[in-house]
Amino acid sequence: MKRSKIIVLLLSVVLCLPGCGKKTDNAEMQQFLKQEGMQLQASGDYTGAIAKYEEALKLADMKVAAEEIDIAYYKASAQYRSGDLAGAIDTYSAILAVKENENSYLGRGLLYVAAKDAQKAEADLNKVLKETKNPLIQGIIYNAVNETQKAKECFEKAKKAEEADAIFYLANIYEKQGDHNYAMILLEEYIESGKANAEGYLSVGRHYFDAGAYEDALTLIRQGISLGESGVLKSLMQEEIACYEKLADFTSAREKAEAYLEKYPDDTLIQREYEFLKSR
């Protein structure tokens, strides 16, 4: 599992901007723009999505409401996924300037980790550690700053409290430590919990793929795709193509490559793969 993908999973985004009660027409247009942004984000067009979210947020007047916060969540997520760490950090700083809260300090602290700004990351994350009693949050913080043993202890405690995400984070730790077999056991447990996200399906699917169990891998990859989570959708679709190729189902592989290129037309690797598949 790549560290950047784990950071994506750790982030919880909240943003508030100044505003005052909005008119019904503005509310309807705001919702429309939000939906457009979500569709663009799901397709991997983060720049377009950010533009839609910003347009929607401009329709707010002088009072922050739940809808503005939700839109801003998507905006910050798109900023992070587009590689705009500075923009995502500014988003968190904006909410913290209005109202301090644990989630925003956590999110900004994790972004500082991703930006390799250890001093600022420590300041934000220590504020959360002093306040939170949640072992999952504690584990997330320790994991982010590479205090692996403390993270493992917190995740074990969270796992006992039936926090399903703790299983995934534990699997990540064991995998990084080279214990791939136990990591796989944990990932399977995570899938069986019924609370797995797309990243979990991708990770387990890749394990099965590497073991040569292509049918099982394909089943898990397709389940992950069905969740529609934009963060790993591109990787899931790539794995789906690879599974069909290994199963010698070149017709399905070609069809999936076509669908992939409709979403990600600039991927030269899959373009070359598609040309190969057309000859099979």
PLM features: residue spans?
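Start-of-helix register in tetratricopeptide repeats
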Residues: 31-32, 65-66, 70, 103, ...
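Canonical tetratricopeptide repeat
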Residues: 35, 67-70, 74, 81, ...
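Short coil turns that delineate tetratricopeptide repeat
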Residues: 61, 99-100, 129-133, 160-163, ...
